[in-house]
Amino acid sequence: MSVNPRAVGALLGTAALLCVLGGCGASPAHERGASEAGRRFAAALAAGDYRTGCELLAPETRDQVEEDAEGPCGPALRELELPRAGATRGVDVYGRDAMLRMTGDTLFLSLFHGGWRVTAAGCEPQAEDEPYHCSLKGG
C-alpha cells in the first residue's frame, strides 16, 4: 500500500488545527493557576499555617480530613505530617484537574469557581498502571 505524503501532511495539519481549536493541551493560564495553588499549599504547610492549608483544600477533601480526625481541619492537617514539597518539577492539566509534581511530593488539584484547590497530597507513584497512593485525599 502506498501513502501519499501530501495527503498525510494535509491530514496532520488538519488534526493539529482541530486540536488547537478544540482545546487539546492545557492553557498556560491553567498550568500557572494549578502550580501557584499547589505552591501556596506547600508553602502554608512548610510555615505551619494549617488554616491557610485547609482553605486551599477542595471541599470534599477538607470534609474527609475533618471526618477522619473527628475534629477541625487545621490540627488534623498538622497530624497528617505530609511530606515537605520543594521545587516544582512539572504540572499536567487535564481539563479541570491537574497533577503537580514537586520535589518531595505530588499534589492533585481541581478547578472550582473560586480557583484551584488541592484534592490530594502526600501522593506517591505505585507500580506501573496503578494509581498514586495519597496520604490526604477526598472522599
Language model: regions and residue ranges:
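Short, charged low-complexity linear segments at domain edges
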Residues: 5-6, 48-50
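C-terminal motif of bacterial Sec signal peptides marking the signal peptidase cleavage site
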Residues: 20-23
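Short, aromatic-enriched amphipathic alpha-helices that serve as compact interaction elements
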Residues: 32-48
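Short, well-ordered alpha-helical segments enriched in acidic and aromatic residues
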Residues: 49-62
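Surface-exposed, charged secondary-structure patches
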Residues: 3, 27-31, 65-113, 120-128, ...
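Bacterial N-terminal signal peptides that target proteins for export
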Residues: 1-12
